[in-house]
Amino acid sequence: MTTNYETMYILRPDLGDEQAEQAITKYQNLLRDQGAEDIQIQNRGKRRLAYEIKKHRDGIYIQLNYTAPATAIAPFERAMRLSEEVIRYLTIKQDIAEEKPPKEEKEKPTKVAATV
Protein backbone atom coordinates (compact mmCIF):
# COMPACT_ATOMS: atom_id res chain seq x y z
CA MET A 1 0.00 0.00 0.00
CA THR A 2 1.34 3.41 -0.89
CA THR A 3 0.94 6.57 1.13
CA ASN A 4 1.45 10.25 0.36
CA TYR A 5 4.44 11.81 2.09
CA GLU A 6 6.03 15.23 2.30
CA THR A 7 9.72 15.62 3.12
CA MET A 8 11.35 18.95 3.81
CA TYR A 9 15.10 19.01 4.13
CA ILE A 10 17.73 21.72 4.49
CA LEU A 11 21.05 21.61 2.68
CA ARG A 12 24.20 23.38 3.85
CA PRO A 13 24.32 26.96 2.54
CA ASP A 14 27.93 26.68 1.36
CA LEU A 15 27.01 24.19 -1.39
CA GLY A 16 27.19 25.58 -4.91
CA ASP A 17 24.23 25.42 -7.29
CA GLU A 18 25.66 22.37 -9.04
CA GLN A 19 26.31 20.52 -5.76
CA ALA A 20 22.79 21.35 -4.53
CA GLU A 21 21.29 19.99 -7.77
CA GLN A 22 23.38 16.82 -7.43
CA ALA A 23 22.09 16.35 -3.87
CA ILE A 24 18.49 16.86 -4.99
CA THR A 25 18.93 14.36 -7.83
CA LYS A 26 20.61 11.88 -5.48
CA TYR A 27 17.66 11.84 -3.07
CA GLN A 28 15.13 11.79 -5.90
CA ASN A 29 16.82 8.71 -7.39
CA LEU A 30 17.03 7.09 -3.96
CA LEU A 31 13.28 7.52 -3.50
CA ARG A 32 12.57 6.23 -7.01
CA ASP A 33 14.73 3.14 -6.33
CA GLN A 34 12.68 2.50 -3.18
CA GLY A 35 9.43 2.50 -5.20
CA ALA A 36 8.27 6.11 -4.86
CA GLU A 37 6.07 7.64 -7.54
CA ASP A 38 4.73 11.10 -8.42
CA ILE A 39 7.79 12.86 -7.00
CA GLN A 40 7.34 16.63 -6.99
CA ILE A 41 10.36 18.76 -6.09
CA GLN A 42 10.19 22.36 -4.92
CA ASN A 43 13.46 24.19 -4.39
CA ARG A 44 12.54 26.89 -1.88
CA GLY A 45 15.96 28.53 -2.14
CA LYS A 46 18.36 29.84 0.47
CA ARG A 47 16.68 31.17 3.60
CA ARG A 48 17.72 32.30 7.04
CA LEU A 49 17.25 29.67 9.75
CA ALA A 50 15.29 30.46 12.90
CA TYR A 51 18.25 29.24 14.96
CA GLU A 52 21.75 28.01 14.29
CA ILE A 53 22.04 24.39 13.10
CA LYS A 54 25.50 22.81 12.95
CA LYS A 55 27.06 26.29 12.99
CA HIS A 56 25.03 27.45 9.97
CA ARG A 57 22.68 30.46 10.02
CA ASP A 58 21.28 29.89 6.48
CA GLY A 59 20.14 26.84 4.55
CA ILE A 60 18.81 25.73 1.17
CA TYR A 61 15.26 24.47 1.66
CA ILE A 62 14.00 21.59 -0.52
CA GLN A 63 10.47 20.16 -0.37
CA LEU A 64 9.51 16.77 -1.82
CA ASN A 65 5.95 15.50 -2.21
CA TYR A 66 5.63 11.88 -3.28
CA THR A 67 3.73 8.62 -3.02
CA ALA A 68 5.71 5.69 -1.63
CA PRO A 69 5.39 2.47 0.34
CA ALA A 70 6.08 2.77 4.07
CA THR A 71 9.26 0.70 3.71
CA ALA A 72 10.86 3.42 1.55
CA ILE A 73 11.07 6.03 4.31
CA ALA A 74 13.64 4.41 6.64
CA PRO A 75 16.44 4.00 4.03
CA PHE A 76 15.72 7.47 2.67
CA GLU A 77 16.00 9.13 6.09
CA ARG A 78 19.06 7.03 6.95
CA ALA A 79 20.84 8.34 3.85
CA MET A 80 19.99 11.91 4.89
CA ARG A 81 21.14 11.34 8.46
CA LEU A 82 24.52 10.04 7.27
CA SER A 83 24.99 12.78 4.69
CA GLU A 84 27.22 15.78 5.36
CA GLU A 85 25.21 18.02 3.02
CA VAL A 86 21.84 17.72 4.83
CA ILE A 87 21.66 19.63 8.10
CA ARG A 88 18.00 18.94 8.96
CA TYR A 89 15.11 16.88 7.55
CA LEU A 90 11.53 16.00 8.39
CA THR A 91 9.12 13.56 6.73
CA ILE A 92 5.39 13.64 7.43
CA LYS A 93 2.54 11.48 6.22
CA GLN A 94 -0.10 13.50 4.41
CA ASP A 95 -3.75 12.83 4.98
CA ILE A 96 -5.45 13.67 1.72
CA ALA A 97 -9.19 13.71 2.19
CA GLU A 98 -11.13 11.94 -0.50
CA GLU A 99 -13.67 14.13 -2.18
CA LYS A 100 -17.17 13.03 -1.36
CA PRO A 101 -19.88 13.71 -3.88
CA PRO A 102 -22.29 16.38 -2.67
CA LYS A 103 -25.51 15.09 -1.19
CA GLU A 104 -28.48 15.55 -3.42
CA GLU A 105 -31.17 17.58 -1.81
CA LYS A 106 -34.60 16.05 -1.99
CA GLU A 107 -37.29 18.35 -3.20
CA LYS A 108 -39.87 18.98 -0.54
CA PRO A 109 -43.45 19.04 -1.72
CA THR A 110 -44.69 22.59 -1.87
CA LYS A 111 -48.10 23.53 -0.60
CA VAL A 112 -50.30 25.05 -3.21
CA ALA A 113 -53.28 27.09 -2.08
CA ALA A 114 -56.33 26.44 -4.17
CA THR A 115 -58.23 29.48 -5.34
CA VAL A 116 -61.96 29.29 -5.85
UniProtKB/Swiss-Prot annotation:
Presence of keyword rRNA-binding: yes
Pfam families tied to this protein: Ribosomal_S6
One Gene Ontology CC term in the entry: ribosome
Comp. bias intervals (Basic and acidic residues): 97-110
MF term (GO), any: structural constituent of ribosome
Function text: Binds together with bS18 to 16S ribosomal RNA.
HAMAP family xref list: Ribosomal_bS6
Family under the similarity heading: Belongs to the bacterial ribosomal protein bS6 family.
Protein name: Small ribosomal subunit protein bS6
